[in-house]
Amino acid sequence: MINLNVLEAARRTGVKKVVSFLSTCIFPDKVEYPLTADKIHDGEPHPSNFGYAYSKRMLEVQGRAYREQYGLEYVSLIPTNIYGPNDNFNLESSHVVPALIHKCYLAKRDDTDFVVWGSGKPLREFIYSEDVGKITQFVLKTTV
């Protein structure tokens, strides 16, 4: 309901363009790579993200409906794993890029091996936070 209220308030107050940010958790749990926007609704999201993923999926659907019904520029971006300045480098709670940076720093500082966990098989995409800012500015200035 929050997403719909925001879109409707924007429409009623004359906002011509809304850029919404979705999350990669909207993609189906079982999906073939590479991830593309046309795969969003091809299956259930991972159970751990079910409610959040569906609210983000509906934001994309609602934005598309507003474009079609009212001719407004309501678009969605799906940034991948974002990293950059002011990130969380805490090894207990950080995401993968800042955790790897921190582990690398500690290995260098302590003259120990830099160990990366896992099999190396998972595929991940990353994007620098300042690039997300540049992309957002581009989208805001560009007609869809």
Regions found by a protein language model. Give the residues of each.
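Hydrophobic positions on the long internal alpha-helix
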Residues: I2, V6-A10, Q62-G63, I135, ...
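Conserved Rossmann-fold NAD(P)-dependent oxidoreductase catalytic core, especially the SDR/UDP-sugar
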Residues: L4-N49
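Active-site Tyr-X1-5-Lys
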Residues: R12, D29, H46-T80, V96-D110
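Active-site beta-alpha turn of Rossmann-fold NAD(P)-dependent dehydrogenases/reductases
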Residues: V19-S23, I78-T80, G120
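Short clusters of hydrophobic/aromatic residues that line enzyme substrate/ligand-binding pockets
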Residues: Y33-A37, F89, V116
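Glycine-rich "substrate-gating" loop/helix at the edge of Rossmann-like oxidoreductase active sites
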Residues: S48-Y52, T80-H95, G118-E130
